[in-house]
A protein has these predicted regions:
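N-terminal "mature-domain start" segment
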Residues: 26-54, 106, 159-167
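Stable alpha-helical elements in mature extracytoplasmic
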Residues: 38, 84, 88, 148-152, ...
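Conserved polar/disulfide-associated segments of primarily extracytoplasmic proteins
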Residues: 48-125, 130-135
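Sec/Tat signal peptide C-region and signal peptidase I cleavage site
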Residues: 20-26
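Short, well-structured beta-strand
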Residues: 109-167
């Protein structure tokens, strides 16, 4: 089940590669899982219908100025973040992505991160996997450097204890 959701999520990432072409108005974003102040030119993007599996929450934010996107996905799962991160890294490898090392634990947190580069070397991503029992959060920063996405995520406030890592 998790493998299917991760594959569907990966397909959603690929479908979102053109995220800079779908502008939406900038404003603070809030949902059942988190709130996030959208600073600068960061804006929520529309997700393609059918790109997100049932019972999964996903939203994409993009900044033309930073040349980056942030994809946040929350799925119901009781898998440990370590196991989920390894499954996801293996799935990216099977799809031909170049995963740079194994997922590593973020010090002092039940959260893991890894990076990958697309097969054509045009898309770089930093992936964070975290959760606490009933949900897993996957936060992917898409773009060359990741600094703009990390700066945006510093403002994220989780509504579920330890669902997201501290950025």
């Amino acid at each position: 089940m998790l493998r299917r959701k991760i594959l569907a999520f990966t397909s959603a990432v690929a479908a979102c590669a053109a995220f800079f072409c779908l502008p939406a108005a900038a404003a603070d974003f809030t949902c059942p899982y988190f709130s996030l102040p959208l600073t600068g030119d960061w804006a929520q993007q529309r997700m393609q219908p059918g790109s997100v599996p049932p019972n999964t929450f996903a939203t994409l934010f993009a900044s033309r100025k930073a040349g980056e996107g942030v994809l946040i996905t929350v799925i119901p799962s009781d898998k440990a973040p370590k196991e989920a991160a390894q499954i996801m890294a293996n799935n990216y490898k099977q799809q031909g992505m170049r995963v740079l090392g194994n997922p590593v634990q973020i010090p002092g947190q039940n959260a893991y991160r890894f990076t990958y580069v697309s097969t054509n070397n045009k898309m770089h991503a930093i992936v964070f996997i975290s959760g606490k029992g009933k949900h897993l959060a996957n936060v992917s920063i898409l773009g060359r450097h990741g600094t703009g996405g990390l700066a945006l995520l510093k403002g994220l406030t989780s509504k579920e204890d330890k669902l997201f890592p501290k950025f």
